[in-house]
Amino acid sequence: MNIEEADVGLAIRHAGDKIGYVHIGESHRGYLGTGNIDFAAIFDALVAIGWNDYVTFESFSTAIVDKDLSLKTAIWRNLWDDNVALARHARQFVELGLETASRKAELVKLAHLSG
């Protein structure tokens, strides 16, 4: 969606319950939150549509990925070399992002009820 859509959050909201799978990755295929993807907008949209399923994460690094695959996928940088640390970071990043989006949505709902 990042390539095809001008507003990923809006695209997620528009697709709504038609979404069956969420697959994310950073713009440079490294650690989430260190590139230029607007994950806050993505998490806000996922909360808005009631997404309550898995979020899959993908990342590549020349230190880990097979050399032939690195060439075929145009990976030329070593952005990480510890699978476990990367996976832990991704899980925490997604969980925190969804929790933050949920809290924001609740605050908006409360503001509308009291306003």
PLM regions: where:
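Histidine-acidic metal/acid-base catalytic patches
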Residues: M1-G115
